[in-house]
């Protein structure tokens, strides 16, 4: 092989290597353009063991709710992907995500369902570059995943109500529905994904407050959905007054349903425990989620753009996706609120990725 042939071969290898990302990017962009033709939140779950899951214990050492690790015997829940009706969405491309958001800060703010989604995205990104150095730090307040090579940080700030929960010497813990005093922690991110709903329905020992307060009025109890609406409106006003849409893109993580009432899918007295397939059919047979309408109403009245990750209806179908007794707490805990990983939150992040491609 002479010099010119060697030079040509090296150039060919370089161009093929360079085009690799271009091909992926083109396919990703085509997928986004296709996705704009329909409502990506309407569709069905398709069993696909050729492409899902996107990661596993070997490619994500910090999974957390790894139900396989904790003894879940079935595996079908790992292989469902979301398919919108009438269009396709781009497959999640971790390298493309990291390249697009190089040097950026992504922030999840909310409860344990936000944490579920944060860990999912961190795993999806880590699996894309498994040999890259990373940091994964869990703290009571702010937890962070970073990949220094890309300068990206994906953060989770625990805040179950978004509004203030304060301690009072005489009354205990007061949930101040019209007050946000630590919103400065939410500033400075390029993408912010907020969530609250899960904690508002808690009762008994699970309830983390003693009183509600609005203005000077303090009450022991009130309608929970009314309290939720007041708090969410407080959050919406804070966003309208403090966020610059040219610097920060804001999303609201839609209400994540629980599956404690088997009567909703034809199994009275049962829960998510033992469920191995999604609900079949075009819609969930149970009653509408109370929080979903409130979220859409509040966001619809906002001055600043907030994009709703409208995942409630699609997630209602996944009665099979919860940890149940495979969350690490043994048979005493039947968790029908959170989600196994890999699993449903990966689809949420795929839809987040699809939405982010619009810029």
UniProtKB/Swiss-Prot annotation:
One of its GO terms (molecular function) is O-acetyltransferase activity. Pfam families: PC-Esterase (PF13839), PMR5N (PF14416). A motif (GDS motif) lies at residues 110-112. A motif (DCXHWCLPGXXDXWN motif) lies at residues 335-349. The keyword Ribosomal protein does not apply. The chain crosses the membrane at residues 7-25. The keyword Transmembrane applies. It is found in: Membrane. GO terms for cellular component: membrane. Its main location: membrane. Keywords: Membrane, Signal-anchor, Transmembrane, Transmembrane helix. It comes from the Eukaryota. It is a single-pass type II membrane protein. Belongs to the PC-esterase family. TBL subfamily. May act as a bridging protein that binds pectin and other cell wall polysaccharides. Probably involved in maintaining esterification of pectins. May be involved in the specific O-acetylation of cell wall polymers. Contains 2 motifs that are conserved in esterases, but it is unlikely that this protein belongs to the catalytically active pectin esterases. This is Protein trichome birefringence-like 42.
């Amino acid at each position: 092989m002479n010099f010119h042939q060697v030079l040509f071969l090296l150039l060919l290898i370089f161009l093929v290597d360079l085009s690799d990302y271009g091909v992926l990017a083109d396919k990703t962009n085509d997928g986004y353009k296709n996705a704009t033709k329909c409502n990506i939140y309407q569709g069905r779950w398709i069993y696909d063991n050729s492409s899902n899951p996107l990661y596993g214990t070997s490619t994500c050492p910090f999974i957390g709710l790894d139900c396989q690790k904790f003894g879940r015997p079935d595996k079908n829940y790992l292989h469902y992907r979301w398919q919108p009706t009438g269009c396709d969405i781009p497959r999640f491309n971790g390298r493309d995500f990291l390249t697009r958001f190089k040097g950026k800060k992504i922030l999840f703010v909310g409860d344990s369902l936000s944490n579920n989604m944060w860990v999912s995205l961190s795993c999806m990104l880590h699996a894309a570059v498994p040999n890259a150095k990373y940091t994964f730090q869990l703290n009571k307040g702010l937890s962070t995943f970073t990949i220094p090579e890309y300068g990206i940080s994906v953060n989770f700030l625990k805040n179950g109500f978004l509004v203030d929960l304060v301690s009072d010497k005489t009354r205990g813990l007061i949930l101040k529905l019209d007050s946000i005093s630590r919103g400065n922690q939410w500033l400075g991110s390029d993408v912010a994904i907020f969530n609250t709903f899960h904690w508002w329905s808690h009762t008994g020992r699970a309830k983390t407050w003693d009183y509600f307060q609005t203005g000077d009025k303090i009450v022991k109890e009130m309608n929970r959905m009314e309290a939720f609406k007041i708090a969410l409106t407080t959050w919406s006003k804070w966003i309208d007054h403090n966020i610059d849409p040219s610097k920060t893109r804001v999303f609201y993580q839609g209400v994540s349903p629980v599956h404690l009432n088997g009567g909703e899918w034809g199994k009275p007295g049962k829960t998510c425990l033992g469920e191995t397939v999604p609900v079949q059919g075009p819609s969930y047979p149970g009653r509408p989620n109370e929080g979903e309408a409130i979220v859409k109403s509040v966001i619809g009245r906002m001055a600043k753009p907030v994009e709703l990750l409208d995942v409630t209806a699609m997630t209602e179908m996944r009665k099979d996706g919860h940890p149940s007794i495979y969350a690490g707490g043994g048979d005493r805990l039947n968790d029908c609120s959170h989600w196994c990983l890999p699993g449903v939150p990966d689809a949420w992040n795929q839809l987040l990725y699809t939405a982010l491609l619009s810029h």
